[in-house]
C-alpha cells in the first residue's frame, strides 16, 4: 500500500484576545463564574473582530505553507459550522441561490493559483472535520496515483453575538492547515490509521448528554483506532487531544477506563485559546514538534469529538 505522509502544519487564531473575565463580563458565555473556566484549564480565548471572516482566517493559515504546495490534486476545505461553508452575503436581498453557493474552497484554489486542484467541502463532521480530512486525503492519494499532494484546511468563526461556550468549553475562532503527500515531509509524520464513530441519534442533543456520551465513545474510538493500526495502547507515545476540561482527560486515562499515562496526553494550547473548533489537534501537534519531546519513530494519536455526534482519531508516526 502506498505510504502517505503529513506535515507543514499551520494555524491562526481570531484577532481579538480576551481573558475569561472579559468574555464573561461581555455575556459571551453561559457560565458566569470565571473561576469555573480557570479551574477547567481555560484562561483566554480568541474571537474575530466584526470585519474578519472565516475565509480571512483560512487564507492566513495557508499563506505560511503555500511555498510547499506542489502538484496539489485536491483541496479539502472543512468547516464545523455550515454557515462558514459559504461566503456569499447578499441572498436576503437578491433571493438568488447562487449567493448561497459562493464556496470558500473555490476562492482558495483561485487565490493560491492551485488551478489543477479539485475542491472538496467537508461540513457535517463539526469539530472532527480536520481529522476526517486525514482519512479522506489518504484514500484519495492512494486511489489517484497522478496526485502527489492534498491541501487540508479548516476555518471557522462564530457569527456575531454568538455564545463562545459549548459543552462547558471556551471556544476560539481560528483556522488551521496542513499538507498530506505521497512523499516524506521534513519534520513530518507517516499516516498510519484512522477510526471514526458517528451516532446520528444524538444529532441534536444538549451539553449534558454530549458530556455523558463523551467518555464511552472516546474509549471505543481510541481503542479501535489502535487495534486497526495493529498496535497496542502502550505503543502510543503521545495523545494529542481536544482542548476540553483538563479533568475529563484524567478520567479518560484512569486505570478503570483507558489506563493511559496522563503525562503523555498533550494539549498545551488549552490555557491560551480554549477549544479552537476543528483546529485543536493541529495546533497541539505543531506544539509537540516544537517542544522537541517527540522522537523519530514514535506514534502519536490525534483525537477529536464533535456535534453530530462524531468521534474521530488518527494515528501518525513521527519521521523527524
Regions found by a protein language model. Name each.
Residues 1-51, 164-224, 305, 314-320:
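Condensing-enzyme catalytic core mediating Claisen C-C bond formation in acyl metabolism
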Residues 5-7, 73-76, 149-151, 237, ...:
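Conserved beta-strand elements of the Class I
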Residues 29-34, 99-113, 145-156, 193, ...:
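Acidic-glycine-rich active-site phosphate/pyrophosphate-binding loop
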Amino acid at each position: 500500500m502506498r505510504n502517505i505522509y503529513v506535515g507543514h502544519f499551520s494555524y491562526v487564531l481570531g484577532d481579538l484576545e480576551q481573558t475569561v473575565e472579559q468574555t464573561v463580563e461581555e455575556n459571551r458565555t453561559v457560565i458566569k463564574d470565571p473561576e469555573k473556566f480557570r479551574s477547567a484549564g481555560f484562561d483566554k480565548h480568541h474571537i474575530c473582530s466584526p470585519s474578519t471572516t472565516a475565509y480571512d482566517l483560512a487564507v492566513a493559515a495557508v499563506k505560511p505553507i503555500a511555498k510547499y504546495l506542489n502538484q496539489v490534486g485536491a483541496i479539502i476545505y472543512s468547516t464545523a459550522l455550515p454557515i462558514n461553508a459559504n461566503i456569499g452575503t447578499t441572498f436576503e436581498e437578491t433571493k438568488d441561490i447562487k449567493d448561497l453557493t459562493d464556496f470558500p474552497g473555490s476562492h482558495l484554489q483561485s487565490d493560491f493559483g492551485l488551478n489543477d486542484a479539485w475542491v472538496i467541502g467537508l461540513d457535517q463532521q463539526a469539530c472532527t472535520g480536520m481529522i476526517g480530512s486525514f482519512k479522506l486525503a489518504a484514500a484519495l492519494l492512494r486511489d489517484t496515483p497522478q496526485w502527489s499532494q492534498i491541501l487540508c484546511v479548516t476555518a471557522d468563526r462564530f457569527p456575531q453575538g454568538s455564545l463562545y461556550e459549548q459543552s462547558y468549553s471556551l471556544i476560539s475562532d481560528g483556522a488551521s492547515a496542513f499538507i498530506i503527500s505521497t512523499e516524506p515531509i521534513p519534520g513530518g509524520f507517516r499516516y498510519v490509521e484512522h477510526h471514526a464513530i458517528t451516532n446520528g441519534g444524538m444529532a441534536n442533543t444538549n451539553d449534558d448528554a454530549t458530556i455523558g456520551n463523551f467518555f464511552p465513545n472516546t474509549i471505543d474510538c481510541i481503542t479501535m483506532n489502535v487495534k486497526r493500526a495493529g498496535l497496542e495502547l502502550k505503543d502510543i507515545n503521545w495523545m494529542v487531544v481536544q482542548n476540553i476540561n483538563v479533568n475529563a482527560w484524567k478520567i479518560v486515562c484512569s486505570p478503570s477506563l483507558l489506563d493511559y499515562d496522563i503525562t503523555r496526553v498533550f494539549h498545551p494550547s488549552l490555557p491560551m485559546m480554549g477549544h479552537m473548533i476543528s483546529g485543536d489537534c493541529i495546533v497541539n501537534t505543531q506544539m509537540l514538534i516544537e517542544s522537541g519531546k517527540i522522537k523519530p519513530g514514535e506514534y502519536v494519536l490525534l483525537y477529536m469529538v464533535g456535534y453530530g455526534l462524531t468521534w474521530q482519531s488518527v494515528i501518525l508516526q513521527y519521521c523527524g
